[in-house]
């Protein structure tokens, strides 16, 4: 009898071409790597449903995915079964059997991302794949002031990668926290959903505010323009982490 199993996954996206598997099977992705592990453990071909399509180089602290299986492996034991076949940069933190109708993507009601910045004159070779280096001191208060303009429901067309054919570019950001501890700055962004590159462009724009290249109130003008060219840079993928997903 078919069952539905949910996974909670942590991964280092450095050596992967994002989450989503590609037609070219030689391209390494997180999804294809976990599917291979499931097939090794169950001897079944499965389709792994992901909660979000993270880009190449983006990391995840608590990614949710699910798959249907006829395997008799108990739900809570799948994490052990799969971790045996996974590389060291992917780990299943939790596994459990869930109702058949559960869908990792469609049932997700909110997400939190965190963008990490190393704010000091010298970069860190050890952290180079996990944090974005900004050598000049950031004005955190200005960044916090700018972030307030992003809270709420807006058309975020200016904060997405150009192109695409979406029904709507309206999204709701529920909270942005900008924290600094020693030389580490973190931008935590929570919302009901995000457009392609949205969190990276928001982070890049807030960094430009922190470097006094823009004023905090410029954010309002950028939103109203709905023009990608008006917003700031798309911050590098290596600093971005999918931190948390929310379900009813």
Swiss-Prot record:
Recorded catalytic activity of this chain's protein: uridine(38/39/40) in tRNA = pseudouridine(38/39/40) in tRNA
GO molecular-function terms, A-Z: RNA binding; tRNA pseudouridine(38-40) synthase activity
EC class of the enzyme, as a word: isomerase
EC number(s) from the headed UniProt entry: 5.4.99.12
Keywords: Isomerase, tRNA processing
Binding site for substrate: 113
Any one Gene Ontology BP term: tRNA pseudouridine synthesis
Catalytic machinery residues: 55 (nucleophile)
Domain of life (superkingdom): Bacteria
Stored InterPro entries: PsdUridine_synth_cat_dom_sf, PsdUridine_synth_TruA, PsdUridine_synth_TruA_a/b_dom, PsdUridine_synth_TruA_C, TruA/RsuA/RluB/E/F_N
UniProt-listed SUPFAM superfamilies: Pseudouridine synthase
UniProt similarity note: Belongs to the tRNA pseudouridine synthase TruA family.
Primary role: Formation of pseudouridine at positions 38, 39 and 40 in the anticodon stem and loop of transfer RNAs.
Subunit details: Homodimer.
Protein name: tRNA pseudouridine synthase A 2
Organism encoding this protein: Clostridium tetani (strain Massachusetts / E88)
């Amino acid at each position: 009898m078919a069952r539905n199993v949910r996974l909670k996954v942590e991964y280092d996206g450095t050596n992967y071409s994002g989450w989503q598997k590609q037609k070219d099977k030689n391209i390494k992705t997180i999804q294809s790597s976990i599917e291979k592990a499931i097939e090794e453990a169950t001897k079944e071909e499965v389709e792994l449903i992901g909660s979000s399509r993270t880009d190449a180089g983006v990391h995840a602290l608590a990614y949710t995915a699910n798959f249907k299986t006829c395997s008799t492996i108990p739900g809570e034991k799948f994490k052990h079964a799969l971790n045996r076949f996974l590389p060291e940069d992917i780990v299943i933190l939790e596994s459990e059997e869930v109702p058949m109708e559960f869908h990792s993507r469609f049932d997700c009601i909110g997400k939190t991302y965190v963008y990490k910045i190393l704010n000091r004159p010298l970069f860190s070779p050890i952290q180079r794949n996990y944090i974005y280096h900004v050598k000049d001191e950031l004005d955190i208060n200005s960044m916090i002031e700018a972030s307030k303009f992003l809270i709420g429901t807006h058309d975020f067309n200016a904060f997405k990668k150009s192109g695409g054919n979406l029904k709507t570019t309206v999204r709701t950001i529920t909270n942005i926290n900008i924290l600094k501890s020693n030389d580490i700055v973190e931008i935590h962004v929570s919302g009901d959903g995000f457009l392609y590159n949205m969190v990276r462009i928001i982070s890049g724009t807030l960094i430009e505010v922190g470097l006094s290249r823009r004023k905090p109130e410029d954010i309002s003008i950028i939103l109203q323009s709905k023009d990608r060219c008006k917003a700031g840079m798309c911050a590098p993928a290596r600093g971005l982490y999918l931190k948390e997903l929310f379900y009813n």
